[in-house]
Amino acid sequence: MKFIALKTKDGSSKGNITFFCRVLHVSRQGYYQYLVMKDRPWKYQPLADAMKDILTEDICNDTYGRTRMYQALTMKQPKNVDIPSERTVYRVMEEIGISHHPRRKPNGITKADREARKSEDLLKRDFHAEEPLTKCVTDMTEIKGCDEKLYVSAIFDCFDSSVIGLAMDTNMKASLCKETLENAAKAYPSIRGAIIHSDRGMQYTSQLYREAIQKYGIQQSMNSAGGRCHDNARCESMWARMKTELLYDRYDTEKMTTDELKTIIWRYFTSYWNNRRICSTNRGLPPMIKRQQYYASLKEAA
């Protein structure tokens, strides 16, 4: 259609229109409809602009897929924008080139101590929690820096996917897991009685970690026999999202020092992840927003 309009100066020569339509197998009616429609504004332009605004709010938002973009639009309710179905949101994202496709996933790094005493699997892959600080998962991951590897350990609350304990060091000893637990207990003293689930890595079966578990009155849970990764899938998926959103195709970590890595990871979890990131498992609510709503509902009920 664009070729015909160019050759005929927008339809000024009827003879040329007939010839080009016949050669290119285009009907004259279709061509004239194109002339009427081509200068009209795209009906999804306000929606496209709103989505681009969402992507620029945070550097990690450019990893939003169709679901989180739809949830972000639903939460924010941009002015003068009619929010269509999730499928239409995806089509518009494809049209303007902002659709996100999942990248690689990290592998687990902890190794089991086959001789150590194991704890029972209390969660049995049920990661749903009705209340905060009842079910938590913990794990660690590694990131290569220019000087040495950085090991990141975290505890996630299954209720809202928030990070309630975080610690980083250049070793993956049991002391790192203990520090993570201590940080969580300091920030949330009511964690006493909660279940904290981990894999069967030697850090979590160590005497040092078990003593910390007992000190804070926490119930320890571990993957079932065989160390199947799906038994701690919730935590593995958290690391995958962090690396996809923060690191992959964004930073060359092997050119960064471990101190620099600590800074961006700490900021990512404590500021972005907990307070601003659209979380699909929370129906789009950032973790701390869901938590605030929960406690607000308890006050209203009282």
Language model segments and positions:
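Short, amphipathic alpha-helical "recognition" segments used to contact nucleic acids or chromatin
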Residues: 1-14, 52-59
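RNase H-like two-metal-ion nuclease catalytic core shared by retroviral integrases
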Residues: 112, 198-200, 206-210, 222-244, ...
